[in-house]
């Protein structure tokens, strides 16, 4: 699958099409579960994480562990970007992203869905899940 095909599958609109960012945000924040939130969030980054990290890890690890490691590597890349900006190495984003990966796996194992709620409530829940993981990461660092 190419990047363009992946983005079209995730967003429902072609890569770079008018309104594609808005569609991505609507899909992500209005997602009916935490798993779906991450399915829709940043499809370009998700394509490369899936292709080069998650899928290769799946050959050797359970999917839940592969996804947590992939979240951690994504966080490490974000920390690296901050370091390259001259702000020093931070490990906060790595920890935060691992927390989000754990949260996603817990919500998946519990089969948590908020499909019966309005878009607004689903967005609040999705944003809250990120905020909760952020708070937990601050306790660890």
Residue ranges with predicted function:
Residues 76, 80-81:
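Active-site His/Glu-centered metal-binding helix of metallohydrolases
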Residues 1-74, 116-141:
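Membrane-interfacial catalytic/cofactor-binding modules of polytopic membrane enzymes
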Residues 82-118:
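Extended hydrophobic/aromatic segments used for targeting, binding, or gating
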């Amino acid at each position: 699958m190419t990047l363009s095909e992946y983005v079209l599958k995730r967003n429902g609109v072609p890569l770079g099409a008018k309104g594609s960012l808005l569609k991505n945000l609507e899909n992500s924040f209005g997602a009916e579960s935490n798993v779906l939130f991450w399915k829709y969030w940043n499809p370009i980054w998700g394509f490369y994480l899936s292709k080069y990290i998650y899928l290769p890890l799946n050959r050797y690890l359970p999917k839940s562990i592969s996804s947590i490691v992939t979240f951690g590597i994504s966080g490490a890349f974000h920390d690296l970007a901050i370091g390259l900006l001259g702000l020093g190495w931070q490990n906060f984003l790595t920890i935060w992203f691992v927390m989000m990966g754990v949260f996603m796996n817990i919500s998946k194992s519990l089969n948590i869905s908020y499909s019966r709620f309005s878009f607004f409530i689903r967005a609040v829940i999705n944003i809250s899940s990120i905020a909760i993981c952020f708070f937990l990461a601050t306790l660890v660092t």
